[in-house]
Amino acid sequence: SYTDRTRAYIKIQDGCSQFCSYCIIPYARGPVRSRNEDEVIEEIKKLAKKGFSEIILVGIHVASYGKDLGNTSLENLLLKADEIDGIKRIRMSSIEPMTLNKSFVDKVKVSKKLCNHFHISLQSGCDETLKRMNRHYTTAQYMEIVNGLRTAFPDTAVTTDIMVGFPGETDEEFQKTAEFVKKADFADAHVFMYSQRRGTPAAKRPDQIPPEVKEKRSKEIIEIVKHSRESFLSRFIGSTHEVLFE
């Protein structure tokens, strides 16, 4: 029920075709299936008429929206939603970094309603670990994306997900992640410990990390993020911003 709410969640797709080595979703939910663009826009219009002023586009793999349809894309959907009367804010749920390339950013930066908040999944700040995870980017590519967003959207909040204790993660690899998290200076992050998902390649690896090591690493990253979050929020002390009440 959305009674007395100002924010609504719009599911725009289901499924995933990424096959990260730790994730069961592609096996459980199947390949990418995008909703018809006109259907999504019509739902947003109806919600706007009911008084909702903020929408969040969600899905299993939001970045892949439209790729199976061939006649639209995530950026096109965003810009069409931007034109709907009554909608004041548009957000996206977690998104893959390589979607937010220069072409995407150049198209959507004209939006008057897209919030200055991008939750860009990192998982690890170590290239060797990312490769074992079957993530399709490097830390250098990720940082380039983040810097591009911060240039196009001043004072944007970049948040992320960080997994510690992935199978085979050495002390050296973890330190690379810790240093990268400091460098990226995230506004916030969801830090979590790797857990096995039966049926995934990562779960079959023999080099699982002991629970006590994962817990120690998690606490270290959480502490780093705590400082970067405080630093980000301190920028806005003394400034005035528009808010939505519900």
Residue spans of the language-model regions?
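Short, hinge-like loop/turn segments at secondary-structure boundaries
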Residues: 73-74, 108-109, 177, 206-209
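Structural detector for short beta-strands of small beta-barrel domains
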Residues: 237-246
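Hydrophobic, well-ordered secondary-structure elements that form the walls
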Residues: 120, 161, 181, 189, ...
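Conserved N-terminal phosphate-binding loop of PLP-dependent enzymes in the Aspartate aminotransferase
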Residues: 86, 186, 201-205, 209, ...
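Proteins enriched for Cys/Gly/acidic motifs involved in redox and nucleic-acid/cofactor modification
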Residues: 1-65, 103, 108, 118, ...
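Conserved SAM/AdoMet-binding glycine-rich loop
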Residues: 49-171
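Contiguous mid-protein beta-loop-alpha structural module that forms a pocket-lining wall or clamp
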Residues: 169, 183-186
